[in-house]
Every structure is written in C-alpha cells, then in structure tokens.
Amino acid sequence: MLRVENILDAARTRLALVNQESPVYEAAEILVDPDRPLVVVCDGEGVVVGVISRTDIVKLLACAKSDALSACADAIMTRSILSCRAHQPLQEVWEAMNARSLRCAPVLDESGRPQGIVHARDLASALLEEVTHEELLLRDYVMGIGYQ
C-alpha cells in the first residue's frame, strides 16, 4: 500500500511558506509560479495555521481595496485546511481531497510543521502506477509466469 511518504520528494519541491504576519503580496509573488499552487502560512514557531491559494488572492482583489495586498497573510488565509501525514495511505488522502474538491494539501509532521504539498496529479499517478503493477502481477500469476 502506497503512503504519502512515497511521493514526499515531489511534495517537498513545491512547498512554499510565509509567516502569518507577512504581507499578502509575498504570497501572491509565490503563487505566480505555476509549480506553487498553494502557500502554507505558519506562525512564529513554524506550525501551520492556514494556507493561501490563488483563489484567496482573487477573492481579495475582487474587493478592490487599494491596500489589499499589504494586508497580513492571516487576514485572508484559509484556516480550516485539509492536511495529511507522511504515514497516511495515498488512497485515503485522495478520497479526502476529492470529497472537498481540492487539488493540493500540505503534508505536516507530527508537530504540525509543513513537510511538503501533495498534488492530486501526484496521487493519481502513484495510485495508477500501483494498480498497473498489481494487474501485471496478477496477469503473471494467472499465466503461470515465474511460478514454475
């Protein structure tokens, strides 16, 4: 059974952090990068307190406040987040993300510190690869290959 730890290297490459006191424009600058779909917001101790997505930035800009981008990150971040741990099965994370229509989620360690960001495409790819491998093993078993 595949677990989040199996795709953690890819998740680490897209991890982007800001402090909850950082201005929103810092998160916006990060989100310009197509490989950074989410910015994790941390407190002074490095513990996750929320996330900022491109949608959060668009909602802020829709308010058309002139000082919107200088607001603190914690003013616009999403506080109720779906996160996962490295030991969790990929299928479980996939189902939770689909239930909430999410494309990505932060991976946290046991103390709530961010380790990476898993993306739905990574989960789908790993799960498909696992199923394909199982099908090949089953086919070989049925055909008697390697069991003679």
Name each region found by the language model.
Residues 1-148:
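Tandem CBS (Cystathionine beta-synthase) repeat/Bateman regulatory domains
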